[in-house]
Amino acid sequence: MKKKISIMLCIVLFALTGCTNSGSTIRFGAADVGGMYYSFANTFTELANEQGYDFTCKVRTTAGSNANIRLLSDDYIEIGIAQADLIADAYKTNEDLRAIAGLYTETCQLVVRADSDIQTLDDLSGHTVSIGAKESGTKRNATQILEFAGMPSSLVATKNLDYIEATKELKAGDIDAFFCTAGLTTTV
């Protein structure tokens, strides 16, 4: 992963050359601590700060993709990680946004306990499901999937939890399933 981040670092730092004042801070919007976005952003900023440039990089925890896009538009962060589908949609309304590189392919997955009776989307009816944190890409994906499957909110009780909270609540039996938009190798 460090090799990929080093290459990305070169690209981003080249793109930012001349965009920052001496001694300034570049704020990197990640997501929740413990996730892949945060891990990537943390490694990226550590490598960037080791280079001795006239600026420093700092990670900002956020709710995820949607939040990062909003925070970029609000000038709260200078770099952010977001899902490709959300970036494409955001670009339609804000042409000042730029994508630097794709990091990895993400899929939206539905996570249940091994002993769960939930086998299909239809089985979610009458259950409690986390659809992701409020400004996350997962929330958007989960909402789209449930709408496409014809599952109105009257049939499924939803909660807005990040992956860490959702995992704890699933183990405790407080929710029955949760959506997770992440790389295939992500551990939850």
Which stretches of residues belong to each language-model region?
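A ligand-binding cleft/hinge motif common to bilobed small-molecule-binding domains
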Residues: 73, 81-93, 143, 147-149, ...
